[in-house]
Amino acid sequence: MANILSIFKTFEIKRLVKFQTLSGPVLILIILSMMVLPLAPFILDLFFTFNIALSIVVLLMSMFTTKTLEFTSFPTILLFSTLLRLALNIASTRIILLNGHIGSCSAGNVIQAFGHFLVGGNFTIGIIVFIILIIINFMVITKGASRIAEVGARFTLDGMPGKQMAIDADLNAGLIGEKQAKKRRIEINQEADFYGSMDGASKFVRGDAIAGILIMIVNIIGGLVIGILQHNMTFSQAAQVYTILTIGDGLVAQIPALVVSTASGVIVTRVSTDQNVSEQIVSQLFCNPQVILLSGIVLGVLGLVPGMPNIIFLIFTTLLFFISWLIYRNPVIFTNFESTMKKIDNTNFCNISDASWNDVQLEGSISIELGNLLIPMIKVNSKKSNLLDKIRNVRKKCAKNIGFLPPLVHIRDNNNLPGNCYCILIKGIEISKGTVQCGKFLAINSGNASGPLPLPAEETSDPIFKFKSFWITSELINQAKQKGYNIAEDSTVISTHLNHIILTHISLLFGRQEAQQLLDYVSKFCPKLIEDLIPNSINLTIFHQVLQNLLIENVPIRDMQTILETLITHAPNYQNDSQILTSLVRISLGKLIIQNIFQNNKIEVIKFDSKLEQILLKTIANKDSVLEPGLYNYIVVKLQQEYNNCKLKNIPCVLLVHHNLRVFIAKMLLKNIPKIFVLSNLELEDVTKIYTTNIIGDQTKT
């Protein structure tokens, strides 16, 4: 049974394909036959009805398409419909002139109905109506559509190179696949062909309108001559019969022509969206209740003019007021729900494709994940200062202070996070997280505030320094400021946290790509230095390692000229040793390092006892030996105590060591007390006054 159904289905498909293939040639043969062979009135009625139906179908099709490329056959249909009308004019002219003397029914019921019913049997009115239709079709609709098609064809052709380049750029960037690129190129070519064809096809309609006028004149004159000379009719009889038939013939041809012309205007004037013409008009015309309300007021004022049909104006005024109220109460009442659902369905079910490289999501250098309640903070059109603007400012500030532009910050939502939570990641690894009350303000007690805040303040802690804080509404801001709290917006909390994370992990964000970008930028100002350095002196890898070593210890790399000159000077001797080159660069940047740490204040440092320093120097001199665990713990504990003391005094904790010890001690402390600054004696060589606050190892017995 299944096999029989399958065979039957295959036969039906083949028959449908054969019908579609033969429909065009058959239609052309029928049109040519109508021009040559005499037709019976019934057959003529059949073809006139078909012509009217075709014009209605074409008009509705043009209105229900969402894109012009959905109806690319329209220029060809325009040609066939014009040819069909001309063939009908020839056939009807033949039958009117042959059998017109018999009566108005001799040319078929359709022509008789248009000649008698539509114009009341008055040929004078018929001629006037016919001329008006010709003017509307020829001078208004066709001329406008022709001009739009001409301009559209020109702009489409002019824009083709740019569109092709955009497709190539998207393809190279991996935003689209090869199949999508090929499909877009085909659509561009089809669009150009369509508008080019429409530019020429519009001339068919204009020619059809002109032909209609000439055919009407020929039919009237020919009918009068034949009626008077061949059928012995009086002038008034011949004029009445042949003119009515000619007017009916003209109207039955020109009304479908007007409909098809309107369809061509709809096609070329529409803007391609996900909505058809009707949906576009309704959704855009009734989107603003104020416009409808003002229209109703103006209409009501006009209705008060003496002599106006007040009842009719009142009805339409009331209708406009009602529509305005309806839109105001329910703004989405005229939106295109059907198209939206169709789009969702297509997204979920129709556009499912095989996995490709476009589905691979590479981790960005730095990213922020937001809970679903924090999504409103990234609205671009928000009147408040939004999160995106503040993140841009963070990158600008870091670029200005550090000396290189941090990577772009990728923001995405994460439904697995609590609604008020956000998470900061570097290369896909979670670094820190916090919570934010969207729309509220964070009152931070940095040590100067006097007492807690009243309800509805919600107690929390600052995400960076863990200070006691409160989430408050705008009504409590003045009260919080009076008590000594620092106030921060919701988006400022996240951006400040991000700024802190970037500064404390800046070395992780400085990769080889950023190093190359920095070189490209500096080459605009110091091209000779770049040319002498890379690849003549050192390679990009060593250059990147030197800068990364500086960033690990929070040394800015703004003074690139000094860095490059130092590397060029010492690279011949230490070409492959990034640690030594880093130490030499630090010596050259000594004044900058001191300025950043001490902020032009008194230089207070901690030192090692000379005996302890000698032990450490002997340890690092022997590359195979390691620091004794007891001594290691002693140094770490003592330095931790010194750091805590400096933190209480709000001064930087700086350890001054021998130049050869600096790298070793810095690496050791980086794992335990990363906030201690380790300087070498050569970096402070130009400093005259150094105050030693403590010496570690005074009581150490070696």
UniProtKB/Swiss-Prot annotation:
State which residue ranges cross the membrane: 21-43, 47-64, 76-98, 118-140, 209-231, 251-273, 285-307, 311-333
Membrane-related topology note: Multi-pass membrane protein
Listed GO biological process terms:
bacterial-type flagellum assembly; protein secretion
Which InterPro entries would you find in this protein's record? FHIPEP_1 (IPR042194), FHIPEP_3 (IPR042193), FHIPEP_4 (IPR042196), FHIPEP_CS (IPR025505), FlhA (IPR006301), T3SS_FHIPEP (IPR001712)
- One CC-aspect GO term: plasma membrane
Keyword annotations of the record = Bacterial flagellum biogenesis, Bacterial flagellum protein export, Cell membrane, Membrane, Protein transport, Transmembrane, Transmembrane helix, Transport
The organism's place on the tree of life at top rank:
Bacteria
Q: Where in the cell is it found?
A: Cell membrane
Looking up Gene3D superfamilies in the UniProt record yields: FHIPEP family, domain 1, FHIPEP family, domain 3, FHIPEP family, domain 4
Key word Oxidoreductase present: no
- Its predominant location is membrane
Q: Which PANTHER family match?
A: FLAGELLAR BIOSYNTHESIS PROTEIN FLHA-RELATED, FLAGELLAR EXPORT PROTEIN, MEMBRANE FLHA SUBUNIT-RELATED
Family listed = Belongs to the FHIPEP (flagella/HR/invasion proteins export pore) family.
Function, as annotated, reads: Required for formation of the rod structure of the flagellar apparatus. Together with FliI and FliH, may constitute the export apparatus of flagellin.
Q: Give the protein's recorded name.
A: Flagellar biosynthesis protein FlhA
User: Organism source for this protein?
Assistant: Buchnera aphidicola subsp. Baizongia pistaciae (strain Bp)
Taxonomy of the source species? Bacteria, Pseudomonadati, Pseudomonadota, Gammaproteobacteria, Enterobacterales
What is the primary gene name for this protein? Answer: flhA
